[in-house]
């Protein structure tokens, strides 16, 4: 039996994974909310360590990093004024690294992310963060609409189990999709 091909492979329009020397690192929602509590994600320890490695490599290479932060409801999940809405230790922006604040899963919707990326002048994006099934995948798909070439670092992403029709879809299955 043959292995199915992706749409990119079938169309001949695929591209190689981004090289950090020509890319912008985009970190999505690296916030404390996902470490514990009702939105705790599976595989966070490994994902956080892998994001830290990406951040270190980008900073050492002088590459741009854009941080995306989800603004929840005051007193609720991802509370922008509360501790759970803050960046995870070691993943907070330094110096002039920009922060794009969003209220929807798509980091381009209602934000200046596209303009900031245009100013940086790179079409190649290396994307990581949380949650794989929501903000990460939605942002990657939207980036394609703007003409960006995205490399998703799956080992630097995490998600959670989700309910579906009285069953559970495990995080590991969602993450693979």
Language-model features: where?
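Class I S-adenosyl-L-methionine
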Residues: 75
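Catalytic metal-binding/acid-base residues of hydrolase active sites
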Residues: 31, 71-72, 105, 131
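Short beta-strand segments at enzyme active-site cores
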Residues: 28, 63-70, 153
């Amino acid at each position: 039996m043959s292995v199915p091909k992706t749409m990119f492979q079938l169309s001949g329009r695929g591209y190689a994974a981004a090289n950090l020397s020509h890319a912008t690192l985009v970190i999505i929602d690296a916030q404390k909310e996902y470490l514990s509590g009702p939105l705790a994600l599976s595989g966070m320890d490994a994902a956080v360590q892998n994001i830290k490695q990406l951040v270190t490599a980008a900073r050492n290479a002088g590459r741009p990093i854009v941080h995306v932060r989800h603004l929840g409801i005051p007193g609720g999940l991802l509370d922008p004024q509360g501790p759970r809405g803050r960046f995870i230790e070691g993943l907070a922006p330094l110096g002039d690294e920009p922060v794009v604040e969003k209220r929807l899963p798509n980091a381009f919707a209602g934000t200046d992310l596209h303009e900031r990326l245009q100013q940086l002048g790179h079409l190649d994006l290396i994307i990581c963060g949380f949650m794989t099934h929501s903000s990460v995948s939605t942002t990657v798909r939207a980036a394609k609409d703007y003409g960006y070439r995205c490399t998703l670092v799956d080992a630097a992403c995490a998600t959670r189990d989700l309910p579906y029709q009285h069953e559970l879809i495990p995080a590991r299955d969602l993450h693979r999709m």
